[in-house]
Amino acid sequence: MRKVRFRSRTEHTLDTKGRLNFPRRFSDVLESFESQDLIIAPFKTHLRIYPLAEWEELETKMHNHGGEQNLSGWVRYVVGGVVEAALDKQGRLLIPQTLRLDAGLEKNVVLNGMLSWIEIWDATAWASEQQAVRDGFEDFSEGLRNMGIL
């Protein structure tokens, strides 16, 4: 069976309680997992949403290698900041205020599928990130060649 992935991006508005309407195409992917539980993790400039199974794989990697290469501070930041979550009956996801503040999320956000997880960016930060990627696109050439894409 082919693994289903999170793809594409959508723009959303957080309501006054910090909830966002979770895109149907992302919830369809989530349904392919045994558990519908989600993990929301801080990631410096944005948040990441992981299906529980994907997060548990990442936790195993952190457990096995987190003490290497002086990563304990990063593990502390990410693991200490995670929140377990689930979609409500209306298909909304509550982003806790602590995580919204940590990632600088205002009212307008962008959800971006990253195959195994979803990113949540403040819309202004997303625009800056995208411009930086466009400006440095040639920097990806070697890696893309190594993967056989170029």
Curated annotation (Swiss-Prot):
GO terms, molecular function: DNA-binding transcription factor activity; transcription cis-regulatory region binding
Source organism superkingdom: Bacteria
Main location as per UniProt: cytoplasm
Keywords assigned: Cytoplasm, DNA-binding, Repeat, Transcription, Transcription regulation
Domain SpoVT-AbrB: 9-54, 82-125
One annotated Gene Ontology cellular component of this protein: nucleoid
InterPro entries found in the cross-reference section: MraZ, MraZ_C, MraZ_dom, MraZ_N, MraZ_sf, SpoVT-AbrB_dom, SpoVT-AbrB_sf
A Pfam family matched in the record: MraZ
Gene Ontology BP, a term: negative regulation of DNA-templated transcription initiation
Subunit structure: Forms oligomers.
Family affiliation: Belongs to the MraZ family.
Protein name: Transcriptional regulator MraZ
Organism this protein belongs to: Desulfotalea psychrophila (strain LSv54 / DSM 12343)
